Amino acid sequence: MKIKLLSTWSELLKETDPIAKIKLAIHQKKVWDAVCNPGIEIIFDTALTGDGKTLAALLPAFYESQNLGKGLFAYPTNELIRDQAKQVEKWSQYLNLAIESHQLNSQTLAEFIKNEGISKIETLRTIANDADLVLTNPDIFTLIHRFFYNQYRGNIAHLSQTWFIYFRYVVFDEFHIFNSAQVTNVLDSIAFSRANATQKYPVKFLFLSATPDKLIQEALEKAGISIKVIKGNYQHGLKDSKTHRCILRDVELELVACQQTSGGAENWINDNLETINQFFRDYPTSKGLLIVNSVFAAKRIVKSLKNNYSCKFTIGENTGLTSLEIRKDSESKQLIIATSTVDVGVDFEINFLVYESLDSGTFIQRLGRLGRHEGFPIYKAIALVPDWVKEKFAEIYANNSEID
């Protein structure tokens, strides 16, 4: 079954922003205004994948630090931290700003302690003092605000207070995949911050997700905390526009019945290797991504393809067990074999996608990796789904339908 997904276009402001000197999407300006509004404590940006939620979050951190303080950005995976660090560097250079950012996870913290020869507490104080932006994960964020790093020395709350005095602009990216414990910790940190904030130095929280979970919003509303939900303005199927920017290109989506009990993606790859070869022959500048549900399946596929003389394209690997060196090397390969590590936020310049999915959420998230970058003659997605999913699609859409 084949479906054509029409391109998506995001509405832009009519005028160039006088501060950033670039044209912003409607939702980006709304986020900036909301963060600067003293009557709004918490903002949810639910703009679509590819519509610049990262830039929407960075602009207040770049230009409003005098009032907001420093920026603390929390991401659900370390892979996403690394990817977003590139975005910070890209935008700070493009906007000609000197921004000191720091990646903070268990590995970088250990390396910093080893290199500087100081204690963990002093290391965290140094990072807080030196960095304009800190990119971390929700677990490190929780350990800081729950006094974990300063349990046995003097005022156990001192380090947490230091961080929350400096970092009064807190961003949670892809928060819909936070587990229940992480959601609880986020709510706890919001309560802690509000209890310690003053009217002169308020704390602002920004949540980013194209597929938001309502749990956090409902909990905040029940607590009587003011929130603002911001959405993008979109049109579909345009050929050209002076008022909108194309954020997702037309995609040819093919739904293929593929049962895990029959070998799943591994069998499909073996049976359709020549089809993939032909795609790369027809479109030699193409870059592709294959996302499977299992790390072990991914590694078996990588090994199988590299040992198969019939495979005429180069292979890369990006899983939770893949070293940074191999991940970096994979960026130059024609087809990257990946897992859920790349589900959220990670930006690939690809025009060919094959993927399994666990549920409707991962179906949309993985499909959202495709069509984000111009310059390719075609954008092709093959979704490997159970029989009943394909049947449900067939009940709703005719073969070769066009949908937005």
Language-model features and meaning:
Residues 1-404:
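N-terminal helicase ATP-binding lobe
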